[in-house]
């Protein structure tokens, strides 16, 4: 839409409302009208000359809603009022004047001299309109009404644009186009400094601040600096504990909108991020990125101390604390400190008694998912850890580590009372109770106390009647693994029968 010499007036692009029409607009729509008109004015002034002419300033006169456009070039102004609206407008005969831009012959990039000349004739504008160009006023008026329609959807909730992949709906076409990038994986915005690519221009803009070193916003509490005001606002909530974003489904609150969005997907089951290799879907893009490392075997994060590599930056950060000894996470109940937040959360369950991970076979509950996974191997018989020395297999990595000490002769834990040594610290602690007589594990049903938790668990099955160990030959179940082992030593088959009364296999001599 380049027009040489800019033979165009402000009234050509003005959108005028009658008094009745103006009264129908709410304050937000009036503000939108003003913003669009000012943008149109900038576009008009800069036609065909790029940045050589810009509007100098827009300022409030302090008198009601009056706004004044200062250009430094337009001489005569007059006010007109439409209802509550008052705007300084270029006098109605401004169409007799026009900007005439004259290029500086010596430097093509300098701002040119400007003059206000008489409009040559109205025929020029007529010829321009009939030369195949759409009138600029019509284009800008259409643009204003487009903005207005889009704004009204905020109030009506209308979302006419639908994603074909996941059927999510949007109020703006541009928002749909941005969303589609999630499915395509396209990253069209590239950093000119380091070639890193981004899905959104806003993410690129944020990234470029890293190269510029911009950090303008400082936290008054801890002195930490941020390159974005919004990031500082989120950070402030870590000090105040504020969680203003609430889930309508379960009432859980969050400090950031993004965390609420991720949480909502637990209720909806939405997983918009798809792996192109195996088709697996994820609720978070960050989890997809981590998953992709499974296919590539890529481990880009390396520890400078020991050279160990990791798939995730967070895992590397946790690993570094092994070298530094840093334990920033403290339990409020007992003041015990931990190097990882997940370890603290798991520890807290000791105080709360919470056991959120439940076995589907026997309904036994555990404090951590890793303990549940280990327990489930009791039912499946899986033993994935093999000793390289003797080929013996184990259900947990810890059992294998203890077993391997038998081959190395390593016995680290020694009793000061009787000089007995153990390959596990827990075994030594349990042994010490023989000398001290301590029995810290008490039955809640009968009050009987035991020196080890395993003995208490075994005892509690007397009260509950729980029998977790099943014989795969005859189907009989036992409360103790040792009883199952004894039972399995009895030959079963031709030399054995099953008593219908007691369901006890008996051998026949």
Curated annotation (Swiss-Prot):
Associated disease: A chromosomal aberration involving ZNF320 is found in a form of glioblastoma. Translocation t(10;19)(q26;q13.3) with BRWD2/WDR11.
Gene that encodes the chain: ZNF320
KW Zinc (keyword) present: yes
Localization (cell): Nucleus
Classification via PROSITE patterns: KRAB (PS50805), ZINC_FINGER_C2H2_1 (PS00028), ZINC_FINGER_C2H2_2 (PS50157)
Database matches in Pfam families: KRAB, zf-C2H2
GO cellular component: nucleus
Residues in C2H2-type zinc fingers: 161-183, 189-211, 217-239, 245-267, 273-295, 301-323, 329-351, 357-379, 385-407, 413-435, 441-463, 469-491
GO biological process: regulation of transcription by RNA polymerase II
MF-aspect GO terms: DNA-binding transcription factor activity, RNA polymerase II-specific; RNA polymerase II cis-regulatory region sequence-specific DNA binding; zinc ion binding
Keywords of the record: Chromosomal rearrangement, DNA-binding, Metal-binding, Nucleus, Proto-oncogene, Repeat, Transcription, Transcription regulation, Zinc, Zinc-finger
Domain KRAB positions: 8-80
Name of protein: Zinc finger protein 320
SUPFAM superfamilies: beta-beta-alpha zinc fingers (SSF57667), KRAB domain (Kruppel-associated box) (SSF109640)
Gene source species: Homo sapiens (Human)
Family, similarity comment: Belongs to the krueppel C2H2-type zinc-finger protein family.
Function: May be involved in transcriptional regulation.
UniProt xrefs under InterPro entries: Ikaros_C2H2-ZF (IPR050589), KRAB (IPR001909), KRAB_dom_sf (IPR036051), Znf_C2H2_sf (IPR036236), Znf_C2H2_type (IPR013087)
UniProt note on tissues of expression: Expressed at high levels in placenta, pancreas, kidney and heart, and at lower levels in liver, skeletal muscle and brain.
